[in-house]
Swiss-Prot record:
Entry's free-text remark on domains: A long coiled coil structure formed by 3 polypeptide chains connects the central nodule to the C-terminal domains (distal nodules). The long C-terminal ends of the alpha chains fold back, contributing a fourth strand to the coiled coil structure.
Residues with PTM Sulfotyrosine: 4
GO annotations of cellular component type: extracellular region
GO annotation (BP), single: adaptive immune response
Post-translational modification: Conversion of fibrinogen to fibrin is triggered by thrombin, which cleaves fibrinopeptides A and B from alpha and beta chains, and thus exposes the N-terminal polymerization sites responsible for the formation of the soft clot.
Keyword vocabulary terms for this entry: Adaptive immunity, Blood coagulation, Coiled coil, Disulfide bond, Glycoprotein, Hemostasis, Immunity, Innate immunity, Secreted, Sulfation
Glycosylated residues in this chain: 2
Taxonomic superkingdom: Eukaryota
Function: Cleaved by the protease thrombin to yield monomers which, together with fibrinogen alpha (FGA) and fibrinogen gamma (FGG), polymerize to form an insoluble fibrin matrix. Fibrin has a major function in hemostasis as one of the primary components of blood clots. In addition, functions during the early stages of wound repair to stabilize the lesion and guide cell migration during re-epithelialization. Was originally thought to be essential for platelet aggregation, based on in vitro studies using anticoagulated blood.
Name of the molecule in the record: Fibrinogen beta chain
Subunit structure: Heterohexamer; disulfide linked. Contains 2 sets of 3 non-identical chains (alpha, beta and gamma). The 2 heterotrimers are in head to head conformation with the N-termini in a small central domain.
Length: 20
């Protein structure tokens, strides 16, 4: 995954979003 959106994080919150 790159940043936000569920790319390889289906139903989960990626650290990119959580950190932003």
């Amino acid at each position: 995954a790159t940043d936000y959106e569920d790319e390889e994080f289906p139903g989960a919150v990626p650290p990119s979003v959580g950190a932003r």
